A protein has these predicted regions:
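Alpha-helix boundary recognition
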Residues: 28-29, 75-76, 117
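Short acidic (Asp/Glu) patches
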Residues: 66-68, 78-83, 113-124
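Short beta-strand segments
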Residues: 31-66, 74, 80-85, 93-97
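Generic structural signal for secondary-structure transition and capping sites
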Residues: 32-33, 79, 121, 142
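Short secondary-structure boundary segments
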Residues: 86-87, 139
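Short, basic/aromatic recognition patches
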Residues: 10-34
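Charged, gly/pro-rich active-site loop segments
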Residues: 2-16, 93-163
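Short, surface-exposed beta-strand-loop junctions and turns on beta-sheet-rich folds
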Residues: 68-70, 89, 150-152
Length: 163
């Protein structure tokens, strides 16, 4: 993986504190929670806090039950948005992450389970839960915003720049 540079250099407003894909991956992995948003077949919004893990390919992985609204929504419409960060008082850094979700199987599922279990060692204890599924989100568009910096640093990436 080479270092991805910003999608739009004019959006990178703070050249003294450059963001690159390595720093972005570290930021994502330093957070275990995200807020995900999806849309139902009736065009109703849904959001929930989820536990996440992040692969070297910038894939976000989480587990959920097949009966949840998020799982049902993503089976109808695979587009998903997540917000990561911004949960700690005084730390105004966030990532907006838009992607496409799927439920991998076979060797891909096993690879992603290992990513998830590295972040959540208790994950294997849930593997036999009825209806448990794993969701992978591949990045389409990512924006890192650091409002702690002066001026604020905002950097955008296309998904293909990160994988």
């Amino acid at each position: 993986m080479g270092l991805a540079q910003p999608l739009n250099p004019s959006v990178d407003r703070n050249s003294e504190n450059p963001m690159n894909s390595v720093v972005l991956l570290e930021f994502l992995r330093s957070h275990r929670l995200a807020v995900q948003a999806s849309v139902s077949s009736a065009s109703r919004p849904q959001a929930a806090v989820i536990g996440i893990a992040v692969s070297d390919r910038f894939e976000i992985v989480f587990d959920t039950l097949e009966t949840t609204r998020k799982a049902q929504n993503l089976r109808h419409n695979s587009n998903i948005a997540l917000v990561i960060g911004g949960l700690t008082a005084g730390d105004e850094r966030t990532v907006q992450f838009e992607g496409e979700a799927d439920e991998p199987s076979g060797s891909e599922l096993e690879r992603l389970k290992m990513v998830y279990y590295s972040a959540y060692p208790d994950g294997p204890s849930r593997v036999n839960w009825p209806g448990l599924t794993y969701v992978r989100v591949r990045p389409i568009w990512v924006r890192y915003s650091d409002y702690n910096a002066n001026p604020p640093q905002i950097v955008e990436y296309r998904g293909e720049e990160l994988v």
